Amino acid sequence: MGQKIHPTGFRLAVSRNWASRWYANNTKFAGMLKEDIEVRDFLKKKLKNASVGRVVIERPARNARITIYSSRPGVVIGKKGEDIELLKAELQRRMGVPVHVNIEEIRKPETDAQLIADSITQQLERRIMFRRAMKRAMQNAMRLGAQGIKIMSSGRLNGIEIARTEWYREGRVPLHTLRADIDYGFSEAETTYGIIGVKVWVYKGDHLGRNDAPVVEEPQDDRRRRPGRPEGRRREGEGRPGGNRRGGAGAGRRAAPGDAKSGE
């Protein structure tokens, strides 16, 4: 199941959180969900060159709080904050409520799955060989601390007639383990031959809970010993030369033929 299901949805409430955090009743849910999708599509097109990894939308008390995670926050903010103000005004017009926009910087873009997928698709659109782009991204991710990475490309690779799928993996990518911190990203490259899809899985270690608390593994002794008797308590006759369990002076030697009882 872990091979097919979406890695983020599989780990919700275990080690991942929702990208849209709000509650609505049955009458308003569909409209708010459609609003979220339109806002994400708008930000994806508007901030195409800003290296946006993910967008979190929250709706507390007739307001909206949008957090944009980007590796290039200066591009989002603009000169003297002009671009961010225009962006906030457009979002308020679309959502109809006061909007607060927060910008969070991604410290290591080489290990962010969505940014890796976007980078590969941009290279494919520039007609760079897909194998070279995939292997370069894998090397950069492993060099900067990722414990495993898997990249899959599907479509008319290199312009061939029949579409195919190729993937490469380096390190460990435990998709079935719920406590594993798996970052997943997907992007599409629009080439002259058609659309090429790129999926990226990045394994960053094991975590427990949404606070990303690392798992502490205690070293285990491989030597398994059977529980012995307490020191100092020994059965009678054990460990002594010529002794047996019942003890006795002559118990350890075989009786000689001449040792028969008198009178026989």
Swiss-Prot record:
**One of this protein's Pfam families, by short name?**
Ribosomal_S3_C
Gene Ontology CC terms, in alphabetical order: cytosolic small ribosomal subunit
Record field: compositional bias (Basic and acidic residues): 221-239
Q: Which GO terms describe its biological process?
A: translation
UniProt-listed InterPro entries: KH_dom (IPR004087), KH_dom-like_a/b (IPR015946), KH_dom_type_2 (IPR004044), KH_sf_prok-type (IPR009019), Ribosomal_S3_C_sf (IPR036419), Ribosomal_uS3_bac-typ (IPR005704), Ribosomal_uS3_C (IPR001351), Ribosomal_uS3_CS (IPR018280)
> So what does this one do?
Binds the lower part of the 30S subunit head. Binds mRNA in the 70S ribosome, positioning it for translation.
What PANTHER family does UniProt report for this protein, alphabetically?
A: 30S/40S RIBOSOMAL PROTEIN S3, SMALL RIBOSOMAL SUBUNIT PROTEIN US3C
> What family is it from?
Belongs to the universal ribosomal protein uS3 family.
Please give the name of this protein: Small ribosomal subunit protein uS3
Q: What is the lineage of its organism?
A: Bacteria, Pseudomonadati, Pseudomonadota, Betaproteobacteria, Burkholderiales
